[in-house]
């Protein structure tokens, strides 16, 4: 379809706007047939201005394939040959070369900022030397039985941190003793790869127990772990004594902790208190923010590694049946085996560091990247994103420097820069499967390194993350769950796309943005599961029965077992409705006093190490709302899959016949407007398979859903927020009218009828409801174009009258041939200085309204001619008028078509933008911010989600919008949106095509052309720079929101008062800070939607004569939600003039007052009285801000154009009392209260 304006006129428009306002035009007046306005936004990152330097590093991946051979650049059958592919590849490499230099400068600056202070390092090293001397003073301890150990510690401060199960003297026939350990530093501090951490860092010190303390079979049944616990307790006891002797006990605190949250690995943590008069010492390292971990390790290969492989059982238990085999004990085996490998891996990494100049810098980048996404080396089997921290990242990088490919080819080279090393590891994580389809093998033994086999990727997966060391037989990724690995892989993929993005600067998103501070931003849905857990002996019978001896052996702790069980149950129940699941044991602790044996052992019973379970989901938007969970097909003999399905779902399972004739086992779910289907599934599955008494809380989800106005339609309470049927009904009504008008016999044929109303793009706050004519969005705008004609008048006023004549003719035809349609005319004042615009308002028999306005090929030409012929002092006003015309007539078509497509691609965009509009209207901002601007701001988290995922829930999308606004420095940063559908992300396809030398088909080329190119992006940035050069503080124009549709960036954001823009930012910051400080709950959500009226200079409370809630098409909260409101109008009034009786007069009143007092006041009100106007929809408010110029006295001028009164002979002040009386008089009987500050 095409708009009516000729291309020549459009080019004239572009040239004039660039020349006069230094901005590009937004509308390519003709719209190509079938063009898709899709969207993939780009968050405007503050680009650092740096000089271009010579490239000292290549950003070419070592595994990149050769470019296709050069062939003739001919195009046939929609194909692009390899020559053009090569040209694209070269252009891309040029952009990447420049980006690589920029990244290098940013990385250098970042590394400098996080570098440890040398004086802090020296300070803590001084204490480490002292600690070494103290440890050497601890006396040896002869062999003791367990009974003697218990007797020794009976009256001591220190308790032995035995791991569960605690040994019993009569069953323990091995001895415990202490001999001096071998002491060494390990970890990042030893590698000099440590960085400054705001919450402090830890230094890992390894104390290796002598080999003679162990027997050959101590690796079985916790024996070596119990020996370590006694060894640690004895060391702690004497360390306390020696610290007191050296007068260091006044500022040093000792406590036990589980290293990496592994309950099988207790350590001693030493920290400092703040220096006081009594604790001043050269050894006090409090200001360094370091703590010291004393790890008790085993000698290297003290136990035969093969006996501790992940598939072996090393915990023997009594079996009820001899035929029953004991399960593997991978967690236990890893804990024992890894305790003997600390020093080995330090040597391995140190050797790699010496060979690779940028190894440490790349390690720091990896650490920052992981920390910002919530990953660590902690055990993830009891929840959290653990199992992959700095240590695992460095081991993987070292392995890839020695191979890593399918043919043992090197993935990384020792001469790579830190950026290339980091990108190489990220690419490997993103593209290689180390869980299901394969694993990576490497050799860490530093001996005979010249002949050491290379790392190799093996096409054999073990269904668990695997990075296997052939030297030590350790799977480095044992601590990582499948769920944690899947999320890591997805983050790596997202980061790789950001690294490959040559258009936008993504440095901040990759390294600087912490996405783990607030779960509701990181995850789409969060459910708090309260389990009936008390003391261990009181554990609910059904839950205890599933945690038998076999489960204890495999999972070690109940926390690990519960996390595994809940994950599996939720994953099976939700299937492809979700992408990822993460379990968190809220309240889990790893630190405990040296006076206690373990965490929570101080309460006289075995309490569990968590308060409740939080289930965190990342949703698949395209599948989450389906009504049916389909299982296996039905057959005469029940298959294993069918039996599992029926057993899992129980009474919910049923047989259903589908349209294709198949009969399938399935579960059918009901929808609700107050919560997603996923909530029902989670409740059912967890209560059935985990605990009948489990309490699953999701009140915040319901709260956000309930803030969306419920349409007064049948069964609306049972309709999902993703359901667009009410919008489809309106579109169907429009289609019928569309056909009627197209068939009319008019002097000029109708060329196109283009809908541009917000309901056509599914973004109107209130859903379309028949006969709801009190809704401000009831009349949906439509652009009507006729065929080209040279007879259109050559003057704007005459042209508008000619348009009106055509609309009159349409009304006559409609009245004569379609009597069920009713219509009337109204004057349109949306374009300043053009008061001759008339619109035709048509009411359909289905109960919907449409407002038709006419566009011709002459309009744009006449507006531009008026600007060219005007005096210089009048041109700014006329240019602003032309912008309004462009936005209303030309750009609105592309905007509507683009967002309509995007609403289908991003399922949650529609409800999110509608909720965002309600928030804006609650705070009286929507009257100043156009619908289009609100819609473009709300689309940012969808088209440019980095570093987060695309929103998969209403609350997640809404909170991300607020988060973006709170961080958007619109004075310095433009918002540039790449409006492309998510499935059109063909960067990976593009790279694969280039690398393989294959041809790019026309479809791929079209998708490439739809994205913003680097030149277009830089052009938009130049427009923003020009704008800020003329308006550096954003006084006249604050929000620069640009896209391919609107490279000028100002179409929808011009005319917003500065106080309104700053208030929007301030409100978003307050909202985000409130939620991060106090969490997401019913109270904080209510506060989000509570306006702060005390900030205004005056507030006028209004009440309309009649309530408008029902006539706005909104179902009242007090009514039964399964029936409609009978008081709502079911037809239009006989006299169409009566329509205005049920429309909110506040809008016209505020519009008039803003025109009258535009020089001195900024007035605001709520636009949607049916939504925010109280229970009946009859309450509104007018708030006023006095402009700063009129806050105090100033000199009198003739052209002040406002009501003032004299202070003295020269100065005047605003006559507020007179203005307030005038406003009250205009409001008349509607005013019920008038407050001033």
From Swiss-Prot:
List the coiled-coil residues.
none
Gene3D superfamilies from the UniProt entry: 1.10.1410.10, 3.30.70.3020, 3.30.70.3030
One Pfam family from the UniProt entry? Nrap_D6
Q: Give the CC-aspect GO terms.
A: 90S preribosome; CURI complex; nucleolus; nucleoplasm; nucleus; small-subunit processome; UTP-C complex
Q: Which GO terms describe its molecular function?
A: RNA binding
| Keywords from the named record | Nucleus, Phosphoprotein, Ribonucleoprotein, Ribosome biogenesis, RNA-binding, rRNA processing
**Which compartments does it reside in?**
Nucleus, Nucleolus
Which stretches are transmembrane?
none
Q: Which residues carry this modification: Phosphothreonine?
A: 60
| Sites bearing Phosphoserine, chain numbering | 10, 58, 64
User: Where is this protein chiefly located?
Assistant: nucleus
InterPro entries attached here? Answer: NOL6/Upt22 (IPR005554), Nrap_D1 (IPR035082), Nrap_D2 (IPR035367), Nrap_D3 (IPR035368), Nrap_D4 (IPR035369), Nrap_D5 (IPR035370), Nrap_D6 (IPR035371)
Q: What else is known?
A: Present with 3260 molecules/cell in log phase SD medium.
Q: Which PANTHER family match?
A: NUCLEOLAR PROTEIN 6, NUCLEOLAR RNA-ASSOCIATED PROTEIN
Task: Indicate the family of this protein.
Answer: Belongs to the NRAP family.
- Its job: Involved in nucleolar processing of pre-18S ribosomal RNA and ribosome assembly.
| Oligomeric and partner information | Interacts with snoRNA U3. Interacts with MPP10. Component of the ribosomal small subunit (SSU) processome composed of at least 40 protein subunits and snoRNA U3. Interacts with UBP10.
Name listed for the protein in its UniProt record: U3 small nucleolar RNA-associated protein 22
Question: Native species of this protein?
Answer: Saccharomyces cerevisiae (strain ATCC 204508 / S288c) (Baker's yeast)
Name the gene that codes for it.
UTP22
């Amino acid at each position: 379809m095409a708009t009516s304006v000729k291309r020549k006129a459009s080019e004239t428009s572009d040239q004039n706007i660039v020349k006069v306002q230094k901005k590009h035009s937004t509308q390519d007046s003709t719209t190509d047939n079938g063009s898709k306005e899709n969207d993939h936004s780009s968050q405007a990152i503050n680009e650092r201005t740096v000089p271009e330097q010579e490239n000292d590093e290549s950003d070419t991946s070592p595994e990149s394939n050769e470019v296709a051979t050069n062939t003739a650049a001919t195009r046939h059958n929609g194909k692009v040959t390899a020559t053009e592919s090569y040209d694209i590849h070269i252009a891309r490499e040029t952009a990447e070369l420049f980006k690589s230099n920029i990244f290098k400068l940013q990385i250098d600056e970042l590394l400098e900022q996080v570098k440890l202070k040398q004086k802090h390092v020296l300070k803590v090293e001084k204490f480490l030397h002292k600690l070494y001397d103290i440890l050497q003073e601890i006396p040896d301890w002869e062999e003791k039985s367990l009974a003697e150990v218990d007797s020794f510690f009976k009256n001591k401060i220190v308790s032995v941190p035995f791991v569960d199960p605690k040994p019993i003297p009569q069953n323990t026939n091995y001895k415990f003793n202490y001999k001096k350990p071998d002491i060494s530093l390990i970890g990042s501090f030893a590698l000099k790869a440590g960085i400054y951490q705001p919450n402090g860092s830890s230094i890992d010190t390894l104390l290796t127990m002598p080999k003679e303390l162990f027997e050959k079979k101590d690796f079985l049944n916790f024996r070596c772990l119990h020996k370590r616990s006694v060894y640690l307790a004895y060391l702690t006891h004497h360390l306390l004594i020696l610290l007191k002797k050296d007068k260091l006990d006044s500022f040093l605190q000792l406590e036990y902790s589980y290293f990496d949250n592994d309950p099988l690995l207790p350590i001693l943590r030493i920290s400092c208190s703040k220096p006081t008069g009594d604790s001043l010492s050269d050894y006090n390292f409090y200001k360094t923010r370091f703590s010291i971990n004393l790890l008790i390790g085993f000698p290297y290969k003290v136990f035969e590694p093969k006996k501790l492989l992940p598939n072996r059982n090393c915990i023997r238990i009594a079996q009820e049946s001899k035929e029953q085999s004991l399960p593997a004990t991978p967690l236990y085996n890893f804990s024992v085996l890894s305790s003997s490998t600390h020093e080995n891996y330090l040597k391995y990494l140190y050797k790699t560091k010496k060979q690779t100049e940028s190894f440490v810098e790349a390690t720091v980048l990896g650490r920052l990247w992981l920390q910002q996404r919530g990953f660590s080396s902690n055990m993830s089997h009891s929840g959290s994103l653990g199992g992959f921290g700095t240590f695992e990242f460095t081991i993987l990088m070292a392995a890839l420097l020695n191979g890593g490919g399918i043919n043992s080819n090197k993935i990384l080279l020792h001469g790579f820069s830190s950026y290339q090393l980091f990108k190489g590891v990220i690419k490997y994580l993103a593209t290689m499967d180390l869980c299901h389809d394969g694993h990576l093998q490497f050799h860490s033994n530093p001996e005979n390194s010249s002949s050491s086999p290379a790392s190799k990727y093996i096409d054999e997966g073990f269904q668990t993350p695997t990075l296997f060391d052939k030297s030590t037989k350790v799977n480095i990724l044992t601590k990582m769950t499948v769920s944690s690995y899947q999320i890591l892989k997805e983050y790596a993929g997202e980061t790789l796309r950001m690294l490959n993005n040559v258009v936008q600067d993504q440095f901040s998103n990759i390294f600087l943005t912490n996405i783990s501070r607030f779960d509701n931003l990181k995850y789409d849905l969060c459910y708090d599961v309260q389990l009936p857990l008390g003391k261990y002996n009181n554990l609910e019978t059904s839950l205890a029965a599933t945690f038998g001896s076999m489960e204890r052996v495999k999972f070690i702790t109940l926390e690990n077992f519960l996390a595994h069980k809940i994950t599996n149950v939720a994953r099976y129940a939700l299937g492809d409705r979700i992408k990822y699941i993460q379990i968190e044991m809220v309240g889990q602790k790893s630190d405990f006093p040296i006076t206690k044996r373990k965490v929570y052992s101080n309460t006289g019973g075995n309490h569990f190490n968590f308060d409740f379970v939080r289930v965190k989901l990342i949703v698949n938007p395209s599948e989450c709302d389906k009504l049916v969970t389909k299982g296996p097909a039905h057959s005469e003999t029940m298959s294993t899959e069918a039996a599992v399905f029926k057993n899992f779902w129980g009474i919910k399972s049923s047989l259903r016949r589908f349209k294709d004739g198949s009969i399938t086992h399935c579960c059918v779910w009901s929808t609700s407007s107050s919560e997603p289907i996923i909530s029902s599934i989670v409740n059912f599955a967890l209560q059935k398979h985990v605990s009948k008494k489990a309490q699953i809380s999701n009140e915040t989800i319901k709260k956000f859903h309930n803030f969306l106005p419920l349409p007064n339609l049948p069964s609306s309470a049972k309709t999902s927020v993703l359901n667009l049927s009410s919008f489809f009904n309106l579109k169907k009504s429009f289609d019928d009218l569309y056909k009627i008008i197209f068939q009319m016999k008019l002097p000029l044929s109708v060329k196109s009828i283009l809908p541009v109303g917000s309901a056509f793009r599914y973004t109107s706050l209130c859903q379309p409801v028949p006969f709801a004519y009190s809704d401000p969005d009831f009349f949906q705008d439509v652009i009507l174009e006729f065929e080209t004609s040279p007879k259109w008048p050559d003057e704007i006023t005459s042209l508008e009258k000619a348009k009106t004549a055509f609309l009159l003719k349409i009304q006559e035809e409609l009245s004569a041939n379609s009597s069920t349609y009713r219509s009337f005319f109204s004057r349109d004042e949306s374009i300043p200085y053009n008061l001759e615009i008339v619109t035709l308002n048509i009411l359909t028999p289905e109960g919907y309204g449409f407002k038709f306005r006419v566009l011709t090929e002459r309009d744009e030409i006449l507006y531009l001619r008026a600007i060219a012929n005007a005096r210089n002092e009048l041109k700014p006003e006329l240019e602003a008028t032309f912008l309004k015309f462009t936005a209303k007539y030309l750009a609105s078509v592309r905007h509507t078509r683009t967002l309509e497509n995007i609403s289908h691609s991003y399922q949650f965009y529609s409800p999110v933008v509608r909720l965002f509009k309600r928030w804006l209207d609650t705070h009286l901002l929507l009257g100043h911010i156009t619908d289009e601007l609100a819609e473009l701001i709300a689309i940012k988290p969808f088209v440019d989600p980095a570093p987060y995922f695309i929103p998969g829930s209403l609350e997640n999308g809404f909170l991300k919008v607020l988060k973006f606004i709170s961080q958007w420095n619109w004075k310095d940063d433009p918002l540039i949106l790449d409006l492309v559908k998510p499935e059109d992300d063909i960067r990976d396809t593009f790279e694969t095509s280039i690398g393989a030398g294959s041809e790019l088909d026309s479809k791929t080329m079209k998708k490439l052309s739809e994205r913003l190119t680097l030149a277009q992006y830089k052009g938009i940035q130049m427009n923003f720079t020009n704008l800020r050069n003329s308006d550096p503080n954003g006084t006249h124009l604050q929000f620069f929101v640009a896209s391919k549709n609107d490279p000028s960036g100002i179409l929808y954001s011009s005319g917003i008062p500065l106080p309104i823009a700053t208030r929007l930012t301030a409100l978003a910051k307050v909202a985000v800070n409130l939620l991060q400080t106090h969490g997401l709950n019913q109270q904080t959500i209510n506060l989000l939607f509570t306006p702060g009226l005390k900030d205004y200079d005056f507030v006028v409370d209004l009440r309309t004569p009649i309530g408008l809630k029902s006539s706005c098409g909104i179902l009242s909260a007090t009514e039964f939600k399964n029936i409609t409101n009978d008081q709502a109008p079911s037809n239009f009034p006989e006299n169409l003039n009566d329509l205005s009786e049920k429309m909110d007069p506040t809008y016209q009143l505020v519009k008039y007052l803003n025109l009258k007092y535009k020089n001195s006041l900024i007035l605001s009100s709520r636009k949607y009285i049916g939504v925010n106007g109280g229970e009946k929809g009859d309450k509104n408010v007018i708030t006023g801000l006095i402009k700063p110029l009129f806050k105090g006295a100033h000199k009198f001028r003739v052209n002040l154009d406002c009501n003032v009164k004299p202070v003295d002979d020269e100065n005047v002040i605003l006559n507020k009392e007179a203005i307030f009386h005038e406003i009250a008089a205009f409001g008349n009987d509607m005013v019920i209260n008038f407050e001033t500050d």
